[in-house]
Amino acid sequence: MKKVITTLLLALLQISCFAVSVETTTNLNVYYPEYTKIDLVCGQMPKATEKNVEFCCEAAFTGELLNEFKHLNIADNHICNGVMKKGYRCKANTGGFVWGKGKWKFMRKADYPTEANGWNMGFCQMLIIKDGSARPIGTKMKNNKNIYRALCEKDGKLCIIESKKVVTYEFFVKCLSDYKVTHALYLDMGRGWNYAWYRDKAGKVVVLHSESKMAPTYKYRTNWITFYK
């Protein structure tokens, strides 16, 4: 009986140790995963039945509506499971992110690695904030309205931050600055590919933006930043 109780306690401890903590501000939802590994999963989104997945959402831009998956259809070169994959050149991307065991780095696109060199995952996107300073916002972009999402570093921790409602891009950047993030990299959002999910402290799957019944026709979903227990 004691062994059974011990096993149950260890299982509960594991669930509580590896879960997503949520903070909120007036305008933002902030998700802090506790994880042992991050990867860029390509081709097929992780399923909620995969118990070792904590959080996953769309990451890099996708180029064309194709009937089959190709790494070349992902914006710029990217690293999946420790292997560098060639993507198409994307002028909109101004930054990048890489992660390896116990370390990560946000950077300008010019500094993005040409080889994996020990990094487990990486991708390029629009750099929003670097070293606490917001990057210049283009005139066309600042008034665009959407529910926005970004991969951020706050007080030495990685987090996913999302606007609570539809806002202008300029306002979203201001909210990130007010929250005092050190770095922020844009994550692809839009109707059909804003679907994401995570596991809470009870191990329950929480869905962010329900998956549309038309999901199989959304060819713009090709890659997901994925946090693992």
Language-model-derived ranges and their functions:
Residues 17-229:
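Gly/Ser/Thr/Pro-rich low-complexity, intrinsically disordered segments
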